[in-house]
Amino acid sequence: MAIHADTHDDLRLFQTGEHACGYWSGRQARDLVLDPHDPRLGAIYPQALAWGFRRSGDLVYRPHCERCRACVPVRIAVDAFHPDRSQRRCLARNRDLVVRVVAAERTDEQLALYRQYLKHRHPGGGMDQHGATEFDQFLIGGWSHGRFLEIREPAIAHLPGRLLAVAVTDVTEHALSAVYTFYAPEAAARSLGTFAILQQIQWAQRERRAHLYLGYWIDGHAKMNYKRRFSALEAYDGRHWRGLPAHASVD
């Protein structure tokens, strides 16, 4: 299969075989994947985001299930975003934290937090065995232009505070893409996942980037509901991006 790109060159796509769905137990899924050996992949990636694709490691994929279209690509138009009451409370609750953007280069501290998060979130599923190699392959890859947004406790005696969360973020000319966020399980009361997205929105606003891509939203899936709580959310229907009304947050 091929698609016609703005460069007037053909891009090859591959369809995967069926595999277990990562969102619904008992269902099968399959994906469309841009040719991982295409040397233009890094240059194509910004347009691929606009086509509803997403990055995992060096793979750029989009769900393409035979009988299901539940996965909807979503993004935030950051200039039109306004936090709701719950999100303002999240910002206030975490105003003591230190946020900085660093190079996408693994550190021992980040790896330890990543492994702690996976053991808490995905026990016994294989991901909890990830080490340095899997960290680099899954989060960094070989061609992406990524950054890590680090969230830390306040510094003590001029030493960096404890690392609480890392939001892996791809950077393109006109957008940011939230690739993966991991955080200290014991700090769950801080709503660090939401806080990370709010920080990514502010980052995009500072750098005058139009959108923050959030991956896929699934209507009725409990783990996806948080994405609908952000205002200025847009969904891709396969041809166009259209606005979605925000759902009210539950404090």
Curated annotation (Swiss-Prot):
GO molecular function per UniProt: arginyl-tRNA--protein transferase activity; leucyl-tRNA--protein transferase activity
Assigned EC number: 2.3.2.29
Gene Ontology CC terms: cytoplasm
Any one of the GO BP annotations: ubiquitin-dependent protein catabolic process via the N-end rule pathway
Subcellular localization, as worded in the UniProt entry: Cytoplasm
InterPro entries: Acyl_CoA_acyltransferase (IPR016181), Asp_Glu_LeuTrfase (IPR017138), N-end_Aminoacyl_Trfase (IPR030700), N-end_Aminoacyl_Trfase_C (IPR007472), N-end_Aminoacyl_Trfase_N (IPR007471)
Keywords on record: Acyltransferase, Cytoplasm, Transferase
First-listed, main subcellular location of the protein, grouped into a coarse class: cytoplasm
Chemical reaction(s) catalysed: N-terminal L-glutamyl-[protein] + L-leucyl-tRNA(Leu) = N-terminal L-leucyl-L-glutamyl-[protein] + tRNA(Leu) + H(+); N-terminal L-aspartyl-[protein] + L-leucyl-tRNA(Leu) = N-terminal L-leucyl-L-aspartyl-[protein] + tRNA(Leu) + H(+)
Top class in the EC scheme: transferase
Source species, domain of life: Bacteria
Functional summary from the UniProt entry: Functions in the N-end rule pathway of protein degradation where it conjugates Leu from its aminoacyl-tRNA to the N-termini of proteins containing an N-terminal aspartate or glutamate.
Family, per entry: Belongs to the R-transferase family. Bpt subfamily.
Entry protein name: Aspartate/glutamate leucyltransferase
Originating organism: Xanthomonas axonopodis pv. citri (strain 306)
